[in-house]
Regions:
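Histidine- and acidic-residue-rich, metal-dependent catalytic cores
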Residues: 113-421
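Membrane-cytosol interface segments
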Residues: 1-140, 396-421
Length: 421
């Protein structure tokens, strides 16, 4: 039954700027990645026409001048100032893609986890030791970091989902330690997705691990302040980039590519970043990768002045910065890494069961592997079984199993950080 705000519209009558709230079929049977989106252009209309006969348009969210009785062709070129979701993924092919290294998972996530747990724990301890030593004698031991990154790269190459799972399950006794390791994991994983060679992955992992070492030169009270920073405090905080670069240059054994990566990882596509206000192609590629890894991990972490947001919320927020804070193509590729329902997300299936996403299916991002936590009656299961939504299509009467919606962190009292497989 149609509501007053959601009107059934034939796809032949769609216009740019309309907000598509529902389809005439399950979202998972289409390539539209998010459930609900604004129509941006004719390409979006043609994609909808290809997959659907009709859709439901929410006219409260659509611009007021749009009606469902008349199509105004002149509005086809209207600029959409707010796109709230990534919705349609097209193949991304460039000349450089032909030279990229193609990596294939060589271990299932469950098997890789047994190794990754040790690697992750040792990495966190190594970073803690490195920071402690730096604070005591002012010397940055780069060799510790290099030896730490090596097994992290190897684990990500075998199966990135294991390290991603552990990064998502991180504890918060020290944000700085865990953020360094987790950002390194995301940077390596992103580089793997882009097809960079192993040497480049080592550089990215090392740069992401060390890009915040300059914060050891900042007042502890500033780093742990629970309120938003003042303008003066923010200016002081920004100095950590220069401190990090100076420490790396003084330590030796660091490539120029890593130095430029660390210096520019807070630069933004529109020129609003720091310290040099670089924009667009002025920003080094490795810095773009590091900036994305840093941003995503920060959003999904508990910080002194900000509570964590779910991976799904982080994806939506980062996508809203597409073309402004971050280069559009970089965002789109990173979305392919984290998935529509990122690892660690709490989700509700169409059966009513509640699960946590534990791994991605690269071929079908809408069909990840999940671990069942609650049954269809929201009762905690005695055993947490894993289900591959791409292949395990029959469960408790759900003839075709899919993710119905993403849940907020902490829904039904579930803390994903306490779950292990």
């Amino acid at each position: 039954m149609e509501s007053q705000k959601q009107i059934k519209v034939n796809t032949a009558d769609l216009e740019p700027s309309m907000y598509v709230a529902r389809l005439d079929r399950p979202w998972t049977e289409t390539p539209f990645l998010f459930q609900g989106f604004f129509i941006r252009n004719q390409d979006d209309i043609e994609a909808l026409q290809h997959h659907c006969q009709y859709v439901y348009v929410d006219f409260e969210q659509s611009p007021k001048e749009i009606t469902h009785t008349k199509t105004d062709v002149s509005r086809e070129n209207r600029t959409i100032t707010q796109i709230t979701s990534l919705h349609y993924a097209k193949p991304h092919t460039t000349a450089s893609n032909r030279n990229r290294t193609v990596y294939v998972n060589s271990q299932p996530v469950e098997k890789e986890l047994s190794v990754a747990r040790t690697v992750y724990a040792e990495a966190n301890q190594a970073v803690a030791d490195l920071i402690t030593k730096l604070e005591v004698d002012g010397r940055l031991d780069v060799q510790i970091a290099k030896e730490t990154v090596e097994p992290m790269v190897e684990s990500v190459l075998r199966n990135p989902d294991a390290m991603i799972w552990l990064a998502r399950m991180k504890k918060y006794d020290s944000y700085m330690y865990h953020h360094s390791v987790s950002s390194s994991i995301w940077g390596i994983t992103f580089g793997r997705h882009l097809g960079l060679d192993k040497s480049a992955l080592h550089e990215i992992g090392l740069g992401c691990m060390l890009f915040d070492v300059g914060k050891t030169k900042l007042p502890h009270a500033l780093l742990t302040k629970a309120d938003q920073l003042t303008k003066t405090e923010w200016h002081v905080m920004r100095n950590h980039v220069d401190y990090s670069v100076n420490l790396l240059e003084g330590a030796g054994g660091i490539t120029e590519r890593i130095i430029s990566m660390v210096r520019s990882h807070h630069e933004r596509h529109d020129g609003s970043g720091y310290p040099d206000k670089l924009k667009e192609n002025q920003i080094p590629t490795f810095a773009k990768i590091a900036g994305m890894a840093d941003c995503y991990d920060a959003i999904t972490s508990t910080r002194p002045y900000s509570k964590l947001r779910s991976p799904y919320e982080a994806v939506r927020e980062i996508y809203s910065w597409r073309g402004t804070l971050f280069q559009a193509e970089v965002v789109e590729q990173f979305m392919q890494v984290v998935g529509v329902f990122p690892t660690g997300s709490l989700v509700e299936l169409n059966s009513g069961a509640v699960a946590v996403v534990i791994a991605q299916n690269e071929a079908r991002r809408l069909k990840p592997r999940v671990m069942l936590i609650l049954d269809e009656n929201k009762k905690r299961l005695p055993q947490f079984n894993t289900v591959d939504l791409l292949f395990d299509t029959h469960l408790k009467g759900a003839e075709n199993l899919w993710i119905e919606k993403c849940l907020e962190s902490g829904a039904y009292g579930i803390d994903p950080q306490e779950l292990y497989i």
